[in-house]
């Protein structure tokens, strides 16, 4: 947790370190890209943790009762697809925020 706090604190300096030649539209583009990448990173990190937990629970359940391994595997694949869908939704939102930002028109 301390590492993340230090990382984001260091990132603030990069976000505000701009040359005086930038106008407001460039700042909006910069913040859009920064927000999209941070959001996508958080979504991918959370999705990876969720997928790892789902796989671990499936392996544990199959080890305890091998007879239901097929049903657990099917349920795990459905859960993984739903977890991955959330990351893809975040990717779509990030692409929209970068390329068709309503604040830039």
From Swiss-Prot:
Single GO cellular component term: proton-transporting ATP synthase complex
Compartments, record wording: Cell inner membrane
Principal subcellular localization: membrane
Pfam families: ATP-synt_C
Highest taxon listed in the record's lineage: Bacteria
Gene3D superfamilies documented for this protein: F1F0 ATP synthase subunit C
Membrane topology type: Multi-pass membrane protein
Transmembrane stretches, start-end: 3-23, 32-52, 78-98
S-S bridge residues: none
Entry keywords, A to Z: ATP synthesis, Cell inner membrane, Cell membrane, CF(0), Hydrogen ion transport, Ion transport, Lipid-binding, Membrane, Transmembrane, Transmembrane helix, Transport
Oligomer status and interactors: F-type ATPases have 2 components, F(1) - the catalytic core - and F(0) - the membrane proton channel. F(1) has five subunits: alpha(3), beta(3), gamma(1), delta(1), epsilon(1). F(0) has three main subunits: a(1), b(2) and c(10-14). The alpha and beta chains form an alternating ring which encloses part of the gamma chain. F(1) is attached to F(0) by a central stalk formed by the gamma and epsilon chains, while a peripheral stalk is formed by the delta and b chains.
Protein name: ATP synthase subunit c
Organism of this sequence: Helicobacter acinonychis (strain Sheeba)
Taxonomic lineage of the native organism: Bacteria, Pseudomonadati, Campylobacterota, Epsilonproteobacteria, Campylobacterales
Encoding gene per record: atpE
